């Protein structure tokens, strides 16, 4: 298993305007499910064959958060979202790349640029492949959502030994009635329950960032305490 580690220089934080960020990376050519799981438990995130985590000098606002699946009960509003999507077709498959995917990705980010002032980058086929398709091995999948044969949402996930790592989701803003972002996460929870998995790893919760603060609304959940190196001691998560 080839592994190469490196770090970025300090740059503007993408989440908090008054902060600087620095990212540590691991490039892992043929990552096993076990290693992936151990890294995710320690606060890393996977995009393609790259794993990353923040190592910012004067900030610890990025908190890894995971949902406790076995204790999770769907609220009345969440059941309404599920019922609204009774005719939405959901396909679990290995990550795909098509014109549909790239068009939907671009449409979603144009919408978020206007709504939340996100920085938008034009993504090529190769860049999308490197970020969301490459390195899926025996754990990477996408949930593809179709309404009347139209691809309206893509949710990229890793199905690991103890849970599901939620990587990235994008959807068609013209179908906002269906609450597709929320519906995709509820699907992850349903799948985890059926597979007897314990956690949904939601990535980073940042209290002062609107785009990431919503994650704390999914309870019960746990926050990772401190950082540990791979296979170093026991990892501590707390409610």
Curated annotation (Swiss-Prot):
It is found in: Cytoplasm. Its EC number is 2.3.2.29. GO terms for biological process: ubiquitin-dependent protein catabolic process via the N-end rule pathway. The keyword Cytoplasm applies. InterPro entries: Acyl_CoA_acyltransferase (IPR016181), Asp_Glu_LeuTrfase (IPR017138), N-end_Aminoacyl_Trfase (IPR030700), N-end_Aminoacyl_Trfase_C (IPR007472), N-end_Aminoacyl_Trfase_N (IPR007471). It is an enzyme of class 2 (transferase). Signal peptide: none annotated. Keywords: Acyltransferase, Cytoplasm, Transferase. GO terms for cellular component: cytoplasm. It holds the Pfam family ATE_C. One of its GO terms (molecular function) is leucyl-tRNA--protein transferase activity. It catalyses: N-terminal L-glutamyl-[protein] + L-leucyl-tRNA(Leu) = N-terminal L-leucyl-L-glutamyl-[protein] + tRNA(Leu) + H(+); N-terminal L-aspartyl-[protein] + L-leucyl-tRNA(Leu) = N-terminal L-leucyl-L-aspartyl-[protein] + tRNA(Leu) + H(+). Transmembrane segments: none annotated. The keyword Magnesium does not apply. Belongs to the R-transferase family. Bpt subfamily. Functions in the N-end rule pathway of protein degradation where it conjugates Leu from its aminoacyl-tRNA to the N-termini of proteins containing an N-terminal aspartate or glutamate. NCBIfam families: PRK01305.2-1 (NF002344), PRK01305.2-3 (NF002346). This is Aspartate/glutamate leucyltransferase. The gene is bpt.
């Amino acid at each position: 298993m080839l592994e190469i580690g490196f770090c970025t220089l300090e740059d503007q934080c993408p989440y908090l305007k008054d902060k600087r960020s620095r990212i540590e990376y691991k490039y892992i050519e043929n990552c096993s499910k076990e290693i992936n799981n151990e890294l995710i438990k320690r606060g890393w995130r996977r995009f393609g064959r790259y794993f990353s985590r923040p190592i910012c000098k004067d900030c610890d606002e990025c908190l890894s958060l995971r949902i406790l699946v076995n204790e999770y009960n769907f609220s009345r509003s969440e059941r309404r979202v599920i019922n609204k999507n009774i005719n939405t077709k959901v396909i679990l498959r290995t990550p795909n790349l098509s014109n549909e995917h790239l068009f939907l990705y671009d449409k979603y980010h144009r919408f978020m640029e206007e709504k939340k002032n996100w920085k938008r980058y034009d993504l090529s086929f190769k860049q999308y492949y490197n970020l969301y398709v490459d390195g899926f091995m025996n754990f990477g999948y996408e949930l593809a959502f179709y309404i009347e044969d139209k691809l309206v949402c893509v949710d990229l996930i890793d199905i690991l030994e103890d849970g599901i790592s939620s990587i990235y989701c994008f959807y068609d803003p013209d179908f906002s009635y269906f609450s597709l972002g929320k519906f995709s996460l509820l699907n992850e929870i349903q799948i985890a329950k059926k597979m007897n998995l314990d956690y949904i790893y939601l990535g980073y919760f940042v209290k002062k960032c609107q785009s990431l603060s919503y994650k704390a609304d999914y309870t019960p959940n746990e926050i990772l305490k401190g950082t540990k190196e791979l296979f170093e001691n026991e990892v501590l998560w707390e409610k």
